[in-house]
Swiss-Prot record:
Catalysed reactions listed for this entry: L-threonylcarbamoyladenylate + adenosine(37) in tRNA = N(6)-L-threonylcarbamoyladenosine(37) in tRNA + AMP + H(+)
This protein's name: tRNA N6-adenosine threonylcarbamoyltransferase
Family: Belongs to the KAE1 / TsaD family.
Main localization, broad class: cytoplasm
Known function: Required for the formation of a threonylcarbamoyl group on adenosine at position 37 (t(6)A37) in tRNAs that read codons beginning with adenine. Is probably involved in the transfer of the threonylcarbamoyl moiety of threonylcarbamoyl-AMP (TC-AMP) to the N6 group of A37.
UniProt EC number: 2.3.1.234
Binding annotation for substrate: 132-136, 164, 185, 264
SUPFAM superfamilies in UniProt: Actin-like ATPase domain
GO terms for biological process, alphabetical: tRNA threonylcarbamoyladenosine modification
PANTHER family with a match to the protein in the record: TRNA N6-ADENOSINE THREONYLCARBAMOYLTRANSFERASE (PTHR11735:SF14)
Compartment(s) where it occurs, according to its Swiss-Prot or TrEMBL record: Cytoplasm
């Protein structure tokens, strides 16, 4: 079985192709193009325009890289949510067009579930406590009774979004990442003094908006590297407190980190210490799968297709607020 997957939930348009043969799964292609705004944040209309322009190019590149054509494809998987509406619509439209034109099954995929599943596949995690950390999501989850249950999450903005907004407003970005290192880490590593900022954890839930607002107000008053250092340390320590509490509650001895923030070296260092203290194993999704990508959609689509999870074209509406705990998982 060969599945083509389309990702377009935010700033990335990606296409992945995954093949299963003789119970062996291989990722044949994982091609993407990410939109970086010249200034400011992401504007939905600009994202949609980027995706429309890149879609035919990325689809062709993926097929060429995989050395297959659409006749070889058994199903088209697409991320229908959560995400930014105009961006989601482009991916959904491309997926519908391919499915109709080549008479292929259409497979609905939840973007967050795809992040988790590619993490499970690439790290060989078995039954972990999952930290899903990205620009739009900060979720602590486990799998139980056919669903990924949420044990903790952000009460307002996501960890990744908070950090991105801060470095942008501080004049450090774009670009947000330089040679694989986020601007917050580049700046924070020069900091020496801790600046007191809001630290808000409620049970296993976190709130990052107060931290962001307070840090921005200090930009003209304190040394920038010190503010960066304090923002990073407080933000990650909030997550660690919630994570440790969730580990105690669930009894898990394995931590899986997925999503774009999983690439943070400083967060990895903190989580390694936490895992060691609790006798747990830390597993982090490889960098090529941490950010948004088409391979994770194709892989999750493959799992879904094997359990006959398809959707008619007329019902393939986008779901910008589609939570991971609302998705039934028949393959686990």
């Amino acid at each position: 079985m060969i599945i083509l997957g389309i990702e377009s939930t935010a700033h990335t348009f990606g296409v992945g192709i995954v093949k299963e043969e003789n119970n062996s799964i291989k990722i044949l292609a994982n091609v993407k193009d990410t939109y970086i705004p010249p200034q400011g944040g992401m504007k939905p209309s600009e994202l949609a325009r980027h995706h429309v322009e890149q879609a035919p190019i990325i689809v062709k590149k993926a097929l060429d890289e995989a050395k297959v054509n659409m006749k070889d494809i058994d199903g088209v998987a697409v991320a229908l949510g959560p995400g930014i509406g105009p961006a989601l619509r482009v991916g959904a439209t491309v997926a519908r067009a391919l499915a109709l034109s080549f008479n292929k099954k259409l497979i609905p995929v939840n973007h967050g579930i795809a992040h988790i599943e590619i993490g499970m596949y690439s790290t060989n995690a078995k039954d972990p406590l999952i930290l899903y950390l990205s620009g739009g999501n900060t979720i602590i989850s486990i799998f139980f009774d056919r669903k990924y249950r949420v044990f903790g999450e952000t009460l307002d903005i996501a960890l990744g979004n908070m950090i991105d907004v801060f470095v942008r407003e501080a004049g450090l970005a774009p670009p947000y990442v330089v040679n694989g290192v986020h601007q917050i880490d580049i700046c924070a590593d020069k900091g020496k003094e801790y600046v007191e900022l809001p630290y808000i954890v409620k049970g296993q839930d976190m709130s990052y908006s107060g931290l962001l607002t307070a840090a921005l107000k200090l930009l003209s008053k304190r040394n920038l590297p010190d503010i960066c250092y304090s923002v990073r340390e407080i933000a990650f320590d909030m997550l660690l407190e919630a994570t440790e509490r969730a580990m105690a509650l669930t009894g898990k001895n394995e931590i899986l980190v997925v999503g774009g923030v999983a690439a943070s070296v400083s967060l990895k260092s903190k989580l390694e210490k936490l895992a060691a203290d609790r006798g747990a194993e830390l597993k982090i999704v490889p960098s090529q799968y941490s950010g948004d990508n088409g391979a994770m959609i194709a892989y999750t689509g493959l799992l879904a297709a094997k359990h006959r999870v398809f959707i008619p074209i007329e019902k393939s509406i986008i779901r910008p607020r589609w939570r991971i705990d609302k998705v039934d998982i028949p393959w686990r």
